[in-house]
Amino acid sequence: GHYAGALENWVRLQHDYETYFLIADYQVSDYADDIKRVRDAVWEVALDWLAVGLDPESSSFVIESLVPEHAELTTWLGWFLPVSMLERNPTLKAEMAAMENPEDGSQERKPVPVAFYTYPVMQVANILLPRAHLVPVGEDQLPHIELTRETARRFNRRFKEIFPEPEALVGRVARLVGTDGNAKMSKSRGNTIDLKDSAETVAKKVKGMYAGPPRGATEPGLVE
């Protein structure tokens, strides 16, 4: 999903623009208390990028935690955005709903951490810090781009024209359905086909993909 929706586009863009690709190691939720796992994940992401053709000679790989200005700008921008605006963010609403109402059938509800409210602000900071003009995203990330544009406008009105209002660039595949039929393929939902998967694992996942409700042999499948 990440390849079809983002990486494929990034490989092309790196030869035409000055590009910065972010490894967002601050933005973890499932294992934020496991530092080794976070560090290992950083390497895995970088290796995936190299494997698909991203070239450090043509673009910059940025590890979020190694640039403290990301956290600093997040703090400053937090003073310009009302909580009500963040609560309307559809991605934030979906993630919070998933934590409060688990889809795996368990009755245990995860408490929503404060960081979930600052998560969209940090994404805004990640875009504004390098003063990005064009941001390659999937369809589900468009609300984040609009939030970034609104934040830039508020900041520029308060002070002076510092941040450009970035434009979104949606790739060839705007949104890829998960292997379980969920509207979005996502690692957090465990419905992905990973770049590092073996041929046997890929075959198993493909054969087990959700193709819609039971139908007759002559009826086409349909996933909404």
Q: Where do the language-model regions lie?
A:
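N-terminal Rossmann-like or analogous alpha/beta NTP/dinucleotide-binding catalytic cores
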Residues: 1-124
